[in-house]
Design a protein with these regions (language model features):
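Sequence signature of WD/YWTD-type beta-propeller architectures
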Residues: 1-159
């Protein structure tokens, strides 16, 4: 009950670390409520620093683990978000070089199957390889972000 904070139905364990042998973090339910996408790593938080971190997904109606192999690589996959219609997943990955986190996007069909991820397009494609900074937690947005360049620049002024 969202008004009282009381649990009204039976509570089930969706992820058991003793059985799975790792930790789950950043659980996010799809907009249609069908799926739970999360990051699994060997231990604790900050999975972005764990090369074995992968994205996993559970179908909530029957608690079946879905195939997420299309999303994962031999290196880190971590922070993620759903598009508002649930047809896309945006996530961070170190699959290109194992050092820098970059954003990938993959389609999701109505049955929870993922398409092949691709590097998030940039106006200048070289930005994906020349940018020597990591992306942190990616989020989809639905509209233009209007920023005053002077105000944003002043946030990074060092006195």
């Amino acid at each position: 009950d969202e008004n009282t904070g009381q649990l009204l139905e039976q509570v089930d364990t969706l992820y058991n670390p003793a059985v799975a042998g790792g930790s789950a973090s950043f659980p996010r339910i799809s907009p249609d409520g069908k799926y739970l996408l999360y990051t699994e790593a060997a231990c604790a938080t900050f999975p972005i620093w764990h090369a074995e971190a992968d994205l996993k997904m559970i179908r909530l109606v029957d608690k079946v683990e879905m195939d997420t192999s299309a999303l994962n690589s031999d290196d880190t996959e971590s922070y993620h978000s759903w598009s508002s219609d649930g047809r896309w997943v945006l996530f961070s990955s170190r699959r290109l070089d194992g050092r820098y986190t970059r954003l990938f996007i993959a389609a999701v069909d109505e049955n929870g199957r993922f398409g092949k991820p691709f590097l998030l397009p940039q106006e200048d494609p070289e930005q994906n390889t020349l940018r020597m900074k990591s992306y942190n937690i990616p989020e989809f947005i639905r509209g233009e972000v209007k920023l005053d360049k002077g105000k944003v620049t002043s946030l990074f002024d060092i006195e």
